[in-house]
């Protein structure tokens, strides 16, 4: 038995650290990261099925323009007035050189998403898309469209419990907005 313990303790596997590596040089697992402002906006448009994939052509539209359903990379960025959505999610200042982008996480970002007309419009579109299905299947479809996965049994049970209240029975847009604002949507593991 002592020989077995000695062999295990002296092995390279036993001596490896279990702490997170900042450089992650061996790429054993991806570090968790938040979507950038552009990626977040585009992901919401894709989830709601509204992203325009055709050649944009013509004049660029502001990010805040409700008719702008193109990718954010094609949007007009004003150096004087940076869009509030982009500003909340660490879009770099267009007036100065930025070698890299900072990443901050603040409560204001969640509040902005929960009160954003852009996010509410995407959520309403998602809610309207699956009107013909029952509750359980509708929840399943929303999870698949927004989070690209099925809900876990506990998530499904919690979601069904949410809709048992008759006042919330028709609040599918609110439910879709909660999924769009969730960490599972905002972050990639």
Segments and roles (model prediction):
Residues 157-167:
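Amphipathic alpha-helical segments that form the core helices of the histone-fold
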Residues 1-10:
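Alpha-helical secondary-structure segments
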Residues 175:
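Globin-like tetrapyrrole-binding proteins
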Residues 2-3, 15, 20-146, 150, ...:
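An acidic, gly/pro-interrupted, aromatic-rich
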Residues 171:
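Active-site neighborhood of thiol-dependent amide/isopeptide-bond enzymes
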Residues 13-14, 168:
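Residue-level marker of structural boundaries
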């Amino acid at each position: 038995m002592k020989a077995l313990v000695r062999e295990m303790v002296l092995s390279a596997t036993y001596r490896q650290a279990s702490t997170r590596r900042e450089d992650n040089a061996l790429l054993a697992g991806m570090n968790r990261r938040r979507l950038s402002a552009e990626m977040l906006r585009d992901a919401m448009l894709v989830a709601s099925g509204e992203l325009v994939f055709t050649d944009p052509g013509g004049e660029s539209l502001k990010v805040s323009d409700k008719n702008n359903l193109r990718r954010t990379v094609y949007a007009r960025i004003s150096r004087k007035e940076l869009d509030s959505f982009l500003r909340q999610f660490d879009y770099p200042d267009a007036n100065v050189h930025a070698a890299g982008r900072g990443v901050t996480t603040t409560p204001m970002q969640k509040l902005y998403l929960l009160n954003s007309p852009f996010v509410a419009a995407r959520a309403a579109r998602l809610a309207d898309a699956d009107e013909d299905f029952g509750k359980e299947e509708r929840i399943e479809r929303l999870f698949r469209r927004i989070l690209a996965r099925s809900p876990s049994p506990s998530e499904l049970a919690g979601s069904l419990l949410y809709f048992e209240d008759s006042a919330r029975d028709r609040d599918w847009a609110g439910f879709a907005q909660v999924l769009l604002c969730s960490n599972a949507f905002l972050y990639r593991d």
